[in-house]
């Protein structure tokens, strides 16, 4: 089918002929296991690279870039947590001007980390108490970092930063709904002042208008990589969606670069990232367990540009070589894999039952996309449209006009330097850079099964081909954009696989006039509404031996900052319906609300009726999950 009008497709063909322009650069997001050797080195293992145009709080146009490392972080694992490696050199590289087509480095931004402990005379490695601010006395293990700009042989220190704690749970309550370590992680926000204190406190203002952030984030990539590499046997059905990265965290390095620092916005730039280690590490035995002695120059061990290229196009024998080389060598070493992609043959054999749908030879269109392997970003456009909750969390809407299919979903931006698809229209997301939320798997497969050499182009849509329509968390619409890391005490992997959209949830504490409201939070996952019962128990707690129970409760439910329901006596409004659930409160002085809610994050606030104070319990139950 033609996903773009023929007139625009004909114009698009011209873009593909010039590697310095923004063409159809579809790519499959990395499953984070791109090459054999780097899978053995998770702290240096690059996961994804993001790059897009934005405007900073001062109103200046900036290029947002981000590098993910350390794949498949299980939330809450300890006592030795996931951290950046002091012995890894993390680099984000930007190519400008003629360097884009040549694959050369123009500007390199280096991040180097240092780890320290407030005390090593304890088994409590990361936290010795509840952390209320980055680097406080309870954050035992604390990492700091430097940011250095390198141009040619000249290095300039831009500044330093601190890494916030990982989201453990009770030890890091402010990451989570209601500032409660037992609750799920907070959803993304649209205003910087709404960021949790750890994330906000770790945003570093560097020299010359740069900003940086480094720390743990939820893995913003989504897709069924398991099925793709299970001989392309893709899952189908509304209850059979499997997100390979669901419930996992990564470590993210984010840098906000003023466009003026790159030579202005009338250009297309290239972006990629690398990790490196020193040549020699010598291990020692004996007392004191000294750290390895490191010597020699830095050796690149991984790189990331268009994630699809190494993982899906490059043969096993060359995958490690790719990680050790620069984009400037791609034409000589790896062009064959774009020109004659094995993936196209596999798709024809397995997915299309032997029909020659995807072109398999002379793929000059793919060569133009991936050689050299860098993200390309048109800096002349306005800010990219941003994702928030996508289809899984409609209560947190994406920007108007955002499509996770990018240009294939009609999401375009206006370029001042390219004709694009006509009138200066260029892709709104991947392949014009890459935003959080872009469905790069679908875009990638669309490109592979299409023919971008014909005029007009032959476009065959692969939207939602892996049966995963969006992320399992809400992105931030403000720096550093990636979502809040999952809570080690409250998270799920793939809740859509026959599991309830939320788990029954409870929290107990003081409430009423002499205390702050008792706050409970819950997140509805999936893509369909569910009916829940939220109840605020007070006087009946005495039946279970709870001392000082509150005499009466009030209950309010919020979606974001908006109150969507309130009650101060469950028998006053929904008595019959609540009784029918079998979950009615035992006392008429207790509040309860039966409500149908869409996927998203919600907060329940419990107060005291008629001036009462005391212990209360707030609970959320799934009543009728939609099949």
Residue locations for each model-derived region?
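Bacterial N-terminal signal peptides that target proteins for export
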Residues: 2-13
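A sequence-level detector for low-complexity, Ser/Thr- and acidic-rich stretches
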Residues: 497-627
